[in-house]
Amino acid sequence: MTLTRHQIRERAFQMLFALNANPEADHDALYQRVLTDDPNQLVPVPDYLATLVNGVLAHQSELDAQIDQYLSTGWQLKRIAKTDLVILRMAFYEIEHVDDVPNRVAVNEALELAKNFSDDRSRRFINGVLAHTLDDETDTQA
């Protein structure tokens, strides 16, 4: 089974969301659950899926600190819907740690995930946070 990067991001979101709810879950079993409906079939884990999941988990504290910088006054990480937080972590990870993904692509993919797994209000919130990130990056490069 060959997955597009978009499909891999969807699977990564599903895995990270599940791990957020149950950090002790068996990673290998979760990989198989998001990759196939057949419990008897063992599917190889795409490299980019493992990169996203392991990268977000390894850098979670750093990613949360970065996200926290871009929240409006009065907002805290614990107030963010779990779906939105997972999407933001993935986007920040791709922006900061994945060189072959342009930042605008990471933002667009995050918005697509929000469209599929969250609601319109959350999509606008995610867009606002990520827009500030790109604005700051543009200011730094200028």
Swiss-Prot record:
GO terms for cellular component: cytosol. InterPro entries: NusB-like_sf (IPR035926), NusB_fam (IPR011605), NusB_RsmB_TIM44 (IPR006027). Disulfide bonds: none annotated. It comes from the Bacteria. GO terms for molecular function: RNA binding. Keywords: RNA-binding, Transcription, Transcription antitermination, Transcription regulation. GO terms for biological process: DNA-templated transcription termination; transcription antitermination. Involved in transcription antitermination. Required for transcription of ribosomal RNA (rRNA) genes. Binds specifically to the boxA antiterminator sequence of the ribosomal RNA (rrn) operons. Belongs to the NusB family. This is Transcription antitermination protein NusB. It comes from Levilactobacillus brevis (strain ATCC 367 / BCRC 12310 / CIP 105137 / JCM 1170 / LMG 11437 / NCIMB 947 / NCTC 947).
